[in-house]
């Protein structure tokens, strides 16, 4: 007995084993499960840090990705997904992450952050990109003059209640009347097991806006890759005409309506307002307490629509580090140099726009 006690006392008295070094790695297929376990546990991480985005982006758009992680003593301490966009028309960039509204480093300590930042910097130089972009929800390098920000995007996030009546009453009067109009007209929401109707409504909407459409296989891959965390919800009239549809992500206690669109009849039946209300109801019933209305550009109709729903805009301080470029990127529909293209695109027949769009949009990110 004395020997057991002495051994235990000696173990307690022994100095703690020093932590091992931080090491940088590229994610391999067998790392995906523990990568995602880290992302789900890390407060800094978002849905857009999940490993599934690598397959979705590479297979949908044919662009190259680098999913870096830092490990210490066999445990992941930080992650940084990156992807390269290379286009004669829109420039050459490395970003975290293209096609995602949030991104950048998600880590538990400063050593991991520094290693991941350094990896991105070295890769950007190696590739010869014009700029590196981090799409963070907060500035990661506020005191580093080599990183720049620009005021272009905002996000709209708001707490929701478990009570439908409370959520309805929180919507400002004018938009609440639109929701009630949709209810009175008998609109209904249906969860789809494929992306067919969603793509139909989405393609119809983006053509009206004059912007290229994503390939249909992109949405199908999102649904297949993220399973129950990716929902397609369509709105129909009482006689089953398609009105609108939205593809949303579920993440922790949040719902993120990400891609959506409406048919021509949507405006007359308040289809878009009803769609987001129907989604809010379903999300609240599922236990969500945050409704993330998503990113919008300042000065756009989408920005005004979300403001009219009572959501407050929060700036997204995306960060840019310049390499071969001498100016911050300006690849967005508000840029005057794209206005002629947008006017011409709106006049295309829908099948032509759906054929040409994916070849252009893969270079936008």
Predicted regions and their residues:
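Active-site/acyl-donor-binding loops of N-acyltransferases
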Residues: 2-19, 84, 138-166, 289-365
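A conserved beta-strand-loop-helix scaffold within acyl/acetyltransferase catalytic domains
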Residues: 21-73, 80-90, 136-268
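Aromatic (often tryptophan-rich) hydrophobic motifs at membrane interfaces
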Residues: 68-80, 87-89, 100, 112-123, ...
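N-terminal cap/recognition module
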Residues: 95-102
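Short intrinsically disordered coil segments
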Residues: 97, 169-178, 332-339
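The substrate-binding groove and active-site-proximal loops of carbohydrate-active enzymes
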Residues: 102-108
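Non-catalytic accessory segments adjacent to catalytic cores
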Residues: 111-155
């Amino acid at each position: 007995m004395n020997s057991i006690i002495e051994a235990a006392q000696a173990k307690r008295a022994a100095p703690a084993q020093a932590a091992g070094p931080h090491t940088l790695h590229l994610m391999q297929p067998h790392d995906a499960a523990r990568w995602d376990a880290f992302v789900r546990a890390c407060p800094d991480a978002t849905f857009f840090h999940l490993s599934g985005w690598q397959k979705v982006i590479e297979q949908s758009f044919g662009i190259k990705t680098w999913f870096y992680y830092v490990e210490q003593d066999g445990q992941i301490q930080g992650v940084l997904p990156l992807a390269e966009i290379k286009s004669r028309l829109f420039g050459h960039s490395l970003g975290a992450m293209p096609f995602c509204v949030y991104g950048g480093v998600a880590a538990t300590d400063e050593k991991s952050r520094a290693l991941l930042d350094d990896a991105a910097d070295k890769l950007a130089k190696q590739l010869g990109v014009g700029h590196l972009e981090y799409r963070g929800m907060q500035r990661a390098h506020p005191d580093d003059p080599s990183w720049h920000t620009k005021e272009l995007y905002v996000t709209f996030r708001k707490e929701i209640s478990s009570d439908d009546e409370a959520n309805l009453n929180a919507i400002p009067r004018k938009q609440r009347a639109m929701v009630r109009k949709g209810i009175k007209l008998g609109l209904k929401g249906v969860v789809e097991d494929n992306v067919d109707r969603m793509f139909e409504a989405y393609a119809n909407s983006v053509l009206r806006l004059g912007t290229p459409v994503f390939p249909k296989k992109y949405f199908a891959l999102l649904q297949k890759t993220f399973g129950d965390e990716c929902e397609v919800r369509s709105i129909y009239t009482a006689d089953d005409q398609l009105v609108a549809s939205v593809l949303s992500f579920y993440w922790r206690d949040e719902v993120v309506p990400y891609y959506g669109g409406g048919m021509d009849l949507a405006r007359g039946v308040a289809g878009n307002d009803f769609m987001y209300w129907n989604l809010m109801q379903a999300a609240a019933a599922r236990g969500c307490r945050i409704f993330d209305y998503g990113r919008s550009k300042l000065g756009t109709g989408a920005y005004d629509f979300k403001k009219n729903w009572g959501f407050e805009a929060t700036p997204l301080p995306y960060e840019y580090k310049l390499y071969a470029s001498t100016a911050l990127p300006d690849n967005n529909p508000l840029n005057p140099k794209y206005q002629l293209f947008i006017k011409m695109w709106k006049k295309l027949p829908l099948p032509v726009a759906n054929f040409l769009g994916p070849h252009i949009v893969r270079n936008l990110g």
